[in-house]
A protein has these predicted regions:
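Short loop/turn segments that connect beta-strands within beta-propeller blades
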Residues: 53-55, 99-103, 161-166, 206-211, ...
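Repeated scaffold domains used in trafficking and secretory/extracellular systems
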Residues: 22, 70-79, 116-127, 174-185, ...
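Blade-level signature of beta-propeller repeat domains, shared across WD40, Kelch, NHL, RCC1
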Residues: 346-396
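Bacterial Sec-dependent N-terminal signal peptides
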Residues: 1-33
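Structural motif
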Residues: 42-50, 94-97, 142-157, 197-205, ...
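A short beta-strand motif characteristic of beta-propeller blades
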Residues: 57-70, 104-116, 166-172, 211-218, ...
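Acidic, serine/threonine- and glycine-rich low-complexity intrinsically disordered segments
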Residues: 164-287
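Conserved beta-strand positions in repeat-built beta-propeller and related beta-rich domains
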Residues: 34-43, 87-91, 134-144, 190-198, ...
Length: 396
């Protein structure tokens, strides 16, 4: 994730001479992309769904529709940066670069061929300046004993590529099974998940100028997946837990002393300004979803609010996304199998949209259903949102 919490998304250009024309540039979101990983065991390829804000309609399998070919197996993440969208396709060892307006392919990159043989299984993306960064499982490997205790070995990588030539500009060794990444102040932050083995999870901090790095390790950080940063350098990490006694949640890692504090239970998170949105689902013994809590944590007040109460368990959330311009919240949901009551991972998903009101200081006030996009059909295996943000020039 490349979002800097508590940062302003305002672009202005003006002149003090009142006789000259003034203009300012306003970011505008045209729509939302939903990356869907498909279902590997059922041979269902991944896809991209697109919600157009003007029509409030969702169009599915848009990459395939525009390019006449499938994305392939298990796309995992996407990033809109400038005029392009980058899609990390884990199962194919490819990075797809497309025009963000049309989804027409600009380049299909075989990562282990173009970037180096260790660049296997691309996972997550972020960007800074003229570079896009991609995390790779790389040489990370896992194995299990007869009691299903996991052992991991080897490390992954993060590669920096030029946004014009798509050539490799740098490669950085990370830890075991790296996932989410972020860049700030010429430093690269990497969530080393250790594939939930809980033996050597960590956060890598790599100096992009010198290539030197350090690790943050803490007993509470056992399976880190996403990371966002404040201007002060504090880190906010989504950790999936150990699927046992340690629940998934959002943690703060202090920039002053690396102190780790748990903030909220969460299976996923996204943020805007000083607000972190997340959800947490509880399951019964047969792994049927029982209850989901939808919360927003504010960094300024350090308080937590509920932004939705799903009394009918209508939503089985799979991922969350927040429009970086206006703060609209989206949740992609799996659906229940009508016969078993369990989640059907082979069925099409649904998109649920929330209109959100913020104070003049950008603090969450309330959220409400958007009836125009409530339960819209999307692809199989939803896993990540990306937003089609462009700019308008207003002259005065």
């Amino acid at each position: 994730m490349a979002v800097l919490l508590m940062g302003a998304a305002m672009f202005t250009a003006c002149d003090d001479n009142d006789n000259e024309q003034h203009e300012y540039i306003v970011p505008v979101t045209k729509g939302a992309f939903l990356v869907c990983s498909g279902n590997m065991s059922s041979n269902i390829d991944g896809s991209v769904s697109y919600l157009d804000y003007t029509s409030n309609q969702v169009a599915n399998k848009q990459f395939q529709a525009q390019n006449g070919r499938s994305l392939g197996g298990t796309p995992n993440d996407a990033l809109v940066y400038g005029s392009k969208m980058y899609i990390a396709v884990t199962g194919e060892n490819t990075l797809e670069v497309v025009d963000a307006k049309t989804l027409k392919s600009l380049r299909q990159i075989k990562t282990n061929v173009t970037f180096g043989e260790g660049c296997l299984k691309p996972r997550h993306l972020t960007a800074s300046g003229d570079k896009v960064y991609i995390s790779f499982y790389g040489k990370s490997e896992s194995s299990y004993d007869e009691n299903w205790n996991a052992t991991t070995k080897g490390n992954g990588y993060v590669v920096a590529i030029d946004t014009t030539t798509f050539t490799r500009q740098g490669i950085y060794e990370a830890g075991s099974f790296p996932e989410g990444i972020s860049v700030a102040d010429k430093k690269l932050y990497v969530c080393n998940s250790d594939y939930a083995a809980c033996t050597k999870p960590s956060i890598s901090i790599i100096d992009l100028t010198t290539g030197s790095g350090s690790l943050i390790k803490n007993d509470n950080i056992v399976n880190p997946q996403k990371i966002v940063l404040t201007a002060a350098g504090d880190m906010y990490v989504l950790d999936f837990g150990n699927y046992g006694d340690k629940k998934s949640g959002v943690y703060k890692i202090s920039a002053k002393n690396n102190e780790v504090t748990r903030l909220i239970d969460a299976n996923d998170m996204d943020c805007i300004g000083s607000n972190i949105f997340g959800y947490y689902t509880e399951f019964d013994a047969s792994y049927k979803p029982v209850k989901t809590t939808y919360q927003v944590y504010n960094l300024l007040s350090q308080g937590t609010s509920t932004f939705y109460t799903d009394t009918n368990n209508e939503i089985i959330p799979a991922c969350i996304g927040v429009d970086p311009v206006v703060g609209t919240v989206f949740i992609a949901s799996n659906v229940k199998n009508a016969d078993t009551g369990k989640t059907d991972y082979k069925a099409n998903s649904k998109i649920f949209m929330f209109n959100v009101e913020y104070s003049q200081h950008g603090v969450f006030v309330s959220a409400s259903k958007n009836a125009n996009v409530w339960g819209a059909t999307a692809g199989v295996g939803p896993c990540a949102f990306a937003f089609n943000v462009t700019t308008n020039v207003i002259k005065y």
